[in-house]
Amino acid sequence: MATREACGQFAAASAAMAAASSQNPSKATMTDPRFRIRPLQQVASACTGAMVTACFMTPLDVIKTRLQAQQQALLSNKCFLYCNGLMDHICPCGPDTPNPAAAKPAPRFSGTIDAFIKISRTEGIGSLWSGLSPTLISALPSTIIYFVAYEQFKARFTDIHYKYTRRPDTIAHDIPHPIPFLVPLLAGVSGRILAVTCVSPVELIRTKMQSQRMTHAEMFGTIRQVVQSQGVLGLWRGLPPTILRDVPFSGIYWTCYEYLKSSFGVVEPTFSFSFAAGAISGSVAATITTPFDVVKTHEQIEFGEKFIFSDNPPKQVATKSVAMRLASIYRMGGVPAIFSGLGPRLFKVAPACAIMISSFEYGKSFFYHYNIDQHNRSNQATKGPGS
């Protein structure tokens, strides 16, 4: 029954999209509360986009991890930071961490392409999706909360903007009123803060269990220990550096993306436009925030090694300000050190942002036309066949 209903929704939405392809909807129609994408529809769109992104990006991270592993032996209580602008997680690199190449000696890799070819030949193409998949799957809730929260905040801020700034003559003639870029900026920042705040305690517990293979009883004991030694706020110990890493990126990313849509007069973006705009926006945001990202990556990895992947975490640790860390990095390597890792970061962030936003926008477009079709059907049923 559910399958037939879903197929019916897909057919109805597809027909509505085909009928509307010959005419471009106005901004007033897109912002009409009657046709707005509902939260559950946003969840479905974000979940689909996150899964597609994970499927495409996991091989790149498996290759990156294998290249790092051959440079130095994986040490106990060490970790690395997985971040592509959409998902951000501290991952353990201890001796008990599952390694897809543990069953056979790993060949030497000279680079990304060489690693891709050798891993595919010696271990099978499926091995490129092993190892990091559980981590990526656990990152889906954060991504879903982030994108749904952005859409909700954007709708609320847009309503507030229209309420206090839209002139009566534009309302009477249904004239679109431009939305300032402060709206996507605030929506992106608010959505990211909400997402990392909700997921931070769960992520701390998950990484602790993963690194030490805890049972559920041991997990609750660890939670009690953290609360007793550091208070309830100890569960959010890694929140500040995460927020300081992600908030600038999110604000710049969404502002650039909405700016591109506005500059090209795009109301309902196509898949190709969303893909290109997402890649450009992600690249701009990644480039601008790279110095800050370098500082916060060092801080987050240090936090992971001292507090998450340590059997005896210290109760207190000396803290350094962002300015102090940035100055220290600059003294050691100058400007190149501050922008270190920009190339690999762009290589990951640009496609991840492009895949995620294009998949998300396609899902939104699907449900948008479905809502219009349902509204029209409801009106026809209300008027009756003879009207």
Swiss-Prot record:
The entry's localization annotation reads:
Mitochondrion inner membrane
The Solcar repeats extend over 37-156, 179-263, 269-366
Name the job this protein performs: Mitochondrial transporter required for glutathione import into mitochondria.
UniProt keyword annotation of Ligase present: no
Q: Where are the transmembrane segments?
A: 43-63, 128-148, 179-199, 235-255, 275-295, 337-357
Q: Which SUPFAM superfamilies match?
A: Mitochondrial carrier
BP GO terms, sorted: glutathione import into mitochondrion; import into the mitochondrion; mitochondrial transmembrane transport
**Gene that produces this protein:** Shawn
- The source's superkingdom equals Eukaryota
**Annotated PANTHER family:** FI19922P1-RELATED
Q: Which GO terms describe its cellular component?
A: mitochondrial inner membrane; mitochondrion
Q: Which family does it belong to?
A: Belongs to the mitochondrial carrier (TC 2.A.29) family.
Q: Which cysteines are joined by disulfide bonds?
A: none
Annotated protein name in UniProt = Solute carrier family 25 protein Shawn
Give the organism's phylogenetic lineage.
Eukaryota, Metazoa, Ecdysozoa, Arthropoda, Hexapoda
* PROSITE patterns reported in the protein's UniProt record: SOLCAR (PS50920)
Annotated knockout phenotype: Lethality caused by neurodegeneration and synaptic defects.
Supply the source organism for this entry: Drosophila melanogaster
Question: Molecular function terms in GO for this entry?
Answer: glutathione transmembrane transporter activity; transmembrane transporter activity
Record membrane topology: Multi-pass membrane protein
